[in-house]
Design a protein with these regions (language model features):
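C-terminal helical cap(s) of enzyme catalytic domains, especially alpha/beta-barrels
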Residues: 20-29, 224-237, 294-317
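Glycine-rich beta-to-alpha transition loops that act as phosphate-gripper elements at the mouths
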Residues: 64-67, 191-197, 246, 263-275
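N-terminal capping/small domains of soluble enzymes
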Residues: 1-61, 66-71
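Glycine/Thr-rich beta-alpha phosphate-binding loop at enzyme active sites
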Residues: 32, 153-167, 201-263
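Catalytic cores of alpha/beta
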Residues: 73-82, 196-208, 258, 271-288
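Hydrophobic faces of well-ordered beta-strands that scaffold small-molecule active sites
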Residues: 7-9, 61-63, 87-89, 146-148, ...
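Alpha-helix-loop-beta-strand connector modules within alpha/beta enzyme cores
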Residues: 44, 48, 52-57, 165-187, ...
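Glycine-rich phosphate-binding active-site loops on the catalytic face of alpha/beta enzymes
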Residues: 9-14, 150-152, 215-221, 270-271, ...
């Protein structure tokens, strides 16, 4: 984990959500379809019950959030903001306590030394001050960013995906951005490729307060059992991910970088090798995420990072900055 930038958790909603019926995953050529349905315990339960174990590993955490209304994004973000503020307050209090303990320890040691000097001999019973070990940092201190997954049905717009509308995307991102104001946590908008012009939606997200873009979410797909005519997934259709999605992700990143040259972009989609990662970086991504590859290989992110380093060495690249956006030179 120390070699990775962060771990992105599954998307969290204001309240617990059961998700879709099984089967939820189906393999397809060069990837898979999934229809998990955003199952999660709800933001409060996750903060209390699951984040501590994740933080204990030393992981830096990106919290993915979703909602059924624009206001839901604000509710989840507010819970994160409260946890972050509480964690920072506790950290500041610990820092003050440790500073005071250090001062007391210093004073006690000096006083004891002076007493021994006056006595002309050391006193084995003299107590020197010790600084108590600092307690572990609050789990919420491990949160480094929030990612708003807007590829979700909007119940206020006939269940149309937020990410399929500039206005709906802006509304959801605006709610989250307002809730996170003052926390110092960057907000990323994770967008869908299932639109006519992704750059327009990306621009709307940035204008509404997103600090960066995560490109892209899955493509909508469907797998049928021809013998029965029934969908192979319990929820009907699903999202296509894996290597089959990679060229779509490269194009999305390339087009958004060209249209929005100052945007921070995280590229995701079908990365399974170091060269895949290099391709998204060359298209204009500032960083990348690895998802589906971890199903078959939980160590894929570390392996891909090592492969990327070797690829850069073989191609004479000494700084990733020289690779990022190379396709636009």
């Amino acid at each position: 984990l120390s070699a990775l930038g962060a771990v992105v958790v599954k998307s969290l909603s204001p309240d617990p959500w059961a998700g879709n019926p099984s089967p939820r995953v189906h393999p397809v050529a060069a990837g898979m379809l999934n229809s998990v349905g955003l199952q999660n315990p709800g933001i409060d339960a996750w903060l209390d019950e699951e984040l501590p174990a994740l933080a204990a590993t030393g992981a830096r955490v990106v919290v993915s959030i979703w909602g059924q209304t624009a206001g839901d994004y604000g509710r989840v973000a507010k819970a994160i903001a409260r946890a972050s503020a509480s964690a920072n307050a506790n950290a500041n209090a610990r820092g003050s306590a440790n500073a005071n303990a250090s001062a007391r320890a210093s004073g006690s040691a000096s006083g004891s030394a002076s007493g021994r000097a006056r006595a002309g001999a050391s006193d084995p019973t003299t107590q020197t001050g010790r600084v108590p070990a600092a307690p572990p940092a609050p789990p919420a201190r491990s949160i480094v960013a929030v990612e708003a997954n807007v590829s979700c049905p909007n119940v206020e717009d006939r269940r149309r995906m937020f990410a399929h509308s500039c206005a709906a995307t802006a509304a959801a991102i605006g709610e989250a951005a307002e809730a996170l104001a003052g926390t110092g946590l960057p907000l990323w908008a994770k967008l869908s490729p299932n639109v006519t012009d992704l750059t327009e939606v990306a621009a709307a997200a940035l204008a509404a307060g997103a600090d960066g873009l995560t490109l892209i979410n899955t493509l909508m797909g469907l797998a049928l059992d021809p013998a029965t005519g029934r969908p192979r997934l319990g929820g009907g259709g699903g999202g296509l991910s894996g290597p089959a999605l990679h060229p779509v992700a490269v194009r999305a990143v390339f087009e958004c970088r060209a249209a929005l040259p100052d945007a921070a972009i995280v590229g995701v989609g079908g990365i399974s090798t170091g060269e895949d990662a290099a391709e998204l970086l060359a298209a204009g991504a500032d960083a990348v995420q690895v998802g589906t590859a971890t199903f078959a290989d939980p160590r894929a992110p570390a392996r891909i990072l090592a492969e990327l380093e070797r690829w850069c060495g073989h191609n004479g690249i000494t700084r990733l900055a020289d690779l990022i956006g190379r396709a636009h030179e």
